[in-house]
Amino acid sequence: MNILMLTFIICGLLTRVTKGSFEPQKCWKNNVGHCRRRCLDTERYILLCRNKLSCCISIISHEYTRRPAFPVIHLEDITLDYSDVDSFTGSPVSMLNDLITFDTTKFGETMTPETNTPETTMPPSEATTPETTMPPSETATSETMPPPSQTALTHN
């Protein structure tokens, strides 16, 4: 526990030391100037700082540079649009209603809105017989092969 407290104290002191040594030193009125070895082209020398550094003040600025004021944000000016919040469910599915489907001429399942029960649409009936629709090879194999329910019983 003592080692942990000592570590926290050392870390706190290190942050204070690094802030003081790595920040550029300020000088002149209201800390406008910077202490440098040599002034930049847009600065002029005013006086001598510590450790043989020159206090340099910008020529372009006025008597001293002011910090810009923070922009004022009025909460009354901010308007949020909550119209989409109620309709968003969080799912990636589209907002189409699944209970109502479009009437199609293809085969498939449609829902009737009145009963909410699935209805299977069948193709229009044609006057065909099984002999005309099935190839001769399939009719021969279907006569010789027993139905699938009987084959399952015979293999057990």
Curated annotation (Swiss-Prot):
The keyword Signal applies. Residues 108-156 are annotated as: Disordered. GO terms for cellular component: extracellular region. Residues 109-144 have a biased composition (Low complexity). Its main location: secreted. Transmembrane segments: none annotated. Disulfide bonds join C27-C55, C35-C49, C39-C56. It holds the Pfam family Defensin_beta_2. GO terms for biological process: defense response to Gram-negative bacterium; innate immune response. The keyword Disulfide bond applies. Residues 68-156 form a propeptide. Residues 1-20 form the signal peptide. It is found in: Secreted. Belongs to the beta-defensin family. Has antibacterial activity. This is Beta-defensin 125. It comes from Homo sapiens (Human).
